[in-house]
């Protein structure tokens, strides 16, 4: 969500001519994240978010746009694409694909309350239930193939012991994915990147309530348990120590179970999937840290944040 691609007033006006969302009043870049160029867009008809895709091409995007459209039609609070006048979900700016979505209420909260964690668990379970009839499929672009291709590139930059640790965990996870137990896990289309900065929370004094989920551009088909592990790994840890906070972790799990109870297979592989979720982000953040791309508003994430989770808890 860093700003890699600038948008001129002329380009913006041409873009908006294909939509029925009014005339532009202001456009402001969003500095968080490292994958796409996102902007807050105000028009005389409302508030929106413009996303320009920096890595994904137009042939890769239908899965993500159709998924959020599907979830929006199920009345879930997600950032879904607004159709063009011709019905299409995708446009182009500066030769790059882009889309427009309503700007949801709420804001980023660094340390969500136990109540917000529970609501996030409930929302995640509702999303998993909602995709039972979603027909499209997409591989995890940050899965095992990405791990294997990234490892040789990272080797010159990280200590030998750290590289050995990563290599051992990648090998262990590859073996796990071949197992009948892993193959039996309930699976479908998942967000796969539902960190705190990809959710919006409404605050009223000390009370917090989940407003919506955004940024589905790492969505893929994977075990639902993996999606839960990714979210729990980020939402329910102490930011200073990296340890799970029991109250918030329990609240998220209870929220999820209240809507979609975890299976016996889920319980058996929970620790392994927690490690897989942590490994995915440790590798990707090491990659982005040592091999960054230029951006006018780029805020890199911290790679060591996940290094302690790659072994079973």
Predicted feature locations:
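ATP/Mg2+ or Mg2+-diphosphate-binding catalytic cores
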Residues: 141, 152-153, 281-313
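All-alpha amphipathic helical-bundle segments outside canonical DNA-binding/catalytic cores
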Residues: 264-274
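ATP-binding pocket architecture of kinase catalytic cores
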Residues: 43-136
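A cross-family kinase active-site recognition segment
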Residues: 110-164, 185-187, 298
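Active-site activation/catalytic loop segments of kinase-like enzymes and analogous catalytic loops
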Residues: 225-261, 275-293
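Active-site acidic catalytic loop and adjacent metal/ATP-binding pocket
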Residues: 36-44, 49-50, 81-82, 174-226
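Conserved NTP-binding catalytic cores of kinases and kinase-like/nucleotidyltransferase enzymes
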Residues: 1-85, 203-208
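An alpha-helical support segment within catalytic cores of ATP-dependent transferases
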Residues: 7-19, 135-136, 150-192, 196, ...
């Amino acid at each position: 969500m860093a700003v890699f691609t600038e948008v001129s007033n002329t380009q913006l006006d041409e873009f908006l001519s294909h939509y029925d969302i009014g005339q532009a009043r202001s456009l402001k870049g969003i500095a968080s994240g490292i994958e796409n160029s996102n902007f807050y867009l105000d028009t005389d008809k409302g508030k929106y978010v413009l996303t320009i895709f920096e890595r994904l091409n137009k042939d890769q995007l239908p899965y993500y746009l159709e998924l959020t459209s599907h979830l929006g039609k199920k009345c879930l609070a997600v950032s879904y694409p607004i159709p063009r006048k011709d019905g299409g979900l995708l446009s182009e700016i500066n030769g790059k694909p882009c889309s427009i979505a309503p700007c949801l209420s709420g804001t980023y909260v660094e340390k969500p309350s136990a109540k917000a964690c529970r609501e996030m668990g409930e929302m995640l379970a509702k999303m998993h239930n909602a995709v039972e009839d979603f027909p499209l499929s997409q591989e995890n672009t940050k899965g095992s193939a990405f791990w294997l291709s990234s490892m040789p590139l990272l080797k010159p930059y990280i200590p030998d012991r750290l590289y050995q640790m990563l290599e051992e965990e990648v090998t262990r996870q590859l073996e796990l994915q071949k197992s009948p137990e892993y193959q039996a896990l309930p699976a479908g289309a998942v967000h796969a990147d539902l960190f705190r900065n990809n959710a919006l929370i409404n605050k009223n004094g000390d009370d917090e309530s989940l407003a919506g989920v955004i940024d589905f551009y790492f969505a893929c088909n994977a075990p639902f348990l993996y999606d839960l592990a990714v979210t729990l790994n980020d939402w329910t840890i102490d930011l200073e120590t990296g340890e799970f906070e029991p109250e918030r972790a329990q609240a998220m799990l209870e929220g999820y179970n209240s809507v979609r109870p975890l299976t016996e297979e889920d319980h058996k592989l929970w620790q392994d999937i927690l490690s897989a979720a942590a490994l995915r982000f440790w590798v990707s953040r090491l990659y982005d840290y040592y091999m960054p791309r230029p951006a006018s508003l780029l805020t890199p994430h911290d790679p060591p944040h996940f290094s302690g989770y790659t072994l079973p808890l």
